[in-house]
Every structure is written in structure tokens, then in C-alpha cells.
Regions:
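Anion (oxyanion) recognition and catalysis
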Residues: 12, 91, 147
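Short beta-strand scaffold segments in enzyme catalytic cores
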Residues: 31-35, 43, 162-166
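Conserved beta-alpha-beta core of the PfkB/ribokinase-like small-molecule kinase fold
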Residues: 71-141, 162
Length: 241
């Protein structure tokens, strides 16, 4: 339907490769309906639509792209089956897998064990681990939960506080840039995209990539809208300190 054509054209205009996008004859394009409070906080109602029909066989059609990627990134607005298949292909070819477990749902260990880097917010981290994060000890216990399931790098986004990250060798908070938020819609998505776009394949610049992502998100929350509020790589680079 019209939304599919509009979105694909929008991607092409942004120089995004659309070769592996599939279209459905039976389902409409997924949509998100967003409300924003006066304080800039949002509530999102999602209609999955065609997104929720993606399966392992569909993912196999994109195997070449996965094999050649620096990173494979997924969130939870497609079926778990599809994510697991994409991550299995990635792991088989030495490609780093990154999971943004949003929206917050329970996840099988089979998916977590295929994940190299996980990036939840506090709510999502608590949902997965069952640990209420109230202090640094709770944070470390949450990180250990993910480590025990084979995940090597954990980033927990903390809103205006910044991002807590942990590896087997280091852990601390990377502070956020202090700005006045108008609309927090797309802040998390901006963080993920900016982080991955900056990250070196060997993860050697992990903290730099987090700072860059924090900068990108700080620009997003000062603007209204979802996709329209997301800055370009060039915009973020110009602001990055």
C-alpha cells in the first residue's frame, strides 16, 4: 500500500540500501502511534503489521548482506525467530551482533546467547533480569545476569544520566549531554544508530562511540517528532566534542 512506497522512497532518498526489503501482499506496513506529555516524555502504541510476518526463511534471503556486515543490529518489533536466524548467520561469519531489547518483553536464553552487545534502557534491563536497579550494586548484578548468558558487552541507557557500560575489563557511566528535552521520541533509536555508525569493528573505540551516541540523542530530544527529529551523521559530528 501507499505507506510502503513512501517509506522505501524515503530510505532511498537517504541513501539507504533497500535491496533486501520485502513487501507483503496480505499485511499493511507497521506503524507507531505516539503521544507526548508536556514534559517531553512519550507513550508509543505499535501496530506490527507486515513486520510481524518476517520469518527465518525471509532472513535467509539476506544472508549475503549479513555475512558482509560489520554489525547486525536488531530490536523486538519483528519475530524472535527472525532475529535468532539473523544472529546465527552473523555469528557463523564472525559478525558482531547487537540487540536493542525494545519494547520490553521476556526473551529466551537462546537469543541472548547469540548476542554480543545488548543495549536496554532501565525498564528493559529490569524486565529481562528481574532486578530492580536502585544503585550501583543492582546495576552490576544486572550486568552479571547478561554476562552469565554469554553477552560480552552491556550498555544500559539511563536517560538524562547517560549510559552505563560494562565489559569484562571495565565498567562506568558515560555522562549524557545536559539539554532541555522537548520530545524524547526516537532518542533510543538515535542512540543505537549513532553508536553503531561510530563503532569500530574491533570495538576499540567503545567509549567514544557511546559519547557520540549520547551527543546524537541530545540533539534528537531537542526536536519534535520521530524520524524527523533524528540528526544526520554530519550534524552530530559538527557538534561532537
Amino acid at each position: 500500500e501507499g505507506n510502503a512506497d513512501f517509506i522505501i522512497d524515503d530510505f532511498k532518498e537517504a541513501s539507504i540500501n533497500t535491496d533486501y526489503i520485502l513487501t507483503s501482499e496480505n499485511e499493511e506496513t507497521g506503524q507507531a502511534f505516539i503521544t507526548v506529555t508536556d514534559e517531553g516524555q512519550n507513550t508509543i502504541l505499535v501496530y506490527g503489521g507486515a513486520n510481524m510476518t518476517l520469518n527465518a526463511e525471509d532472513v535467509n534471503h539476506g544472508e549475503q548482506a549479513i555475512r558482509e556486515a560489520d554489525f547486525v543490529v536488531a530490536q523486538l518489533e519483528i519475530p524472535i525467530e527472525a532475529i535468532e536466524q539473523a544472529f546465527k548467520i552473523a555469528k557463523a561469519h564472525g559478525v558482531t551482533t547487537i540487540l536493542n531489547p525494545a519494547p520490553a518483553i521476556d526473551l529466551p536464553d537462546s537469543l541472548l546467547s547469540l548476542t554480543d552487545i545488548i543495549i536496554p534502557n532501565e525498564t528493559e534491563a529490569e524486565r529481562l533480569s528481574g532486578i530492580s536497579i536502585k544503585n550501583e550494586a543492582d546495576m552490576q548484578q544486572t550486568v552479571d545476569y547478561f554476562f552469565e548468558r554469554g553477552i560480552s558487552t552491556v550498555l544500559i541507557t539511563l536517560g538524562e544520566q547517560g549510559t552505563y557500560f560494562a565489559t569484562q575489563h571495565d565498567s562506568h557511566i558515560v555522562p549524557a549531554y545536559q539539554v532541555k528535552a522537548i520530545d524524547t521520541t526516537a532518542a533510543g533509536d538515535t542512540f543505537i544508530g549513532a553508536f553503531v555508525s561510530r563503532l569500530e569493528r574491533d570495538l576499540s573505540n567503545l567509549e567514544d562511540a557511546i559519547r557520540f551516541a549520547n551527543q546524537a540523542s541530545s540533539l534528537t530530544v531537542q526536536r519534535k517528532g520521530a524520524q524527523a527529529s533524528i540528526p544526520t551523521y554530519k550534524e552530530v559530528t559538527a557538534q561532537y566534542q
